[in-house]
């Protein structure tokens, strides 16, 4: 997810 660590 773009908002957390690129996960």
Curated annotation (Swiss-Prot):
The modification Leucine amide is found at residue 7. It comes from the Eukaryota. GO terms for cellular component: extracellular region. Keywords: Amidation, Neuropeptide, Secreted. GO terms for biological process: neuropeptide signaling pathway. Its main location: secreted. It is found in: Secreted. May act as a neurotransmitter or neuromodulator. Belongs to the allatostatin family. This is Carcinustatin-5. It comes from Carcinus maenas. The lineage of its organism: Eukaryota, Metazoa, Ecdysozoa, Arthropoda, Crustacea.
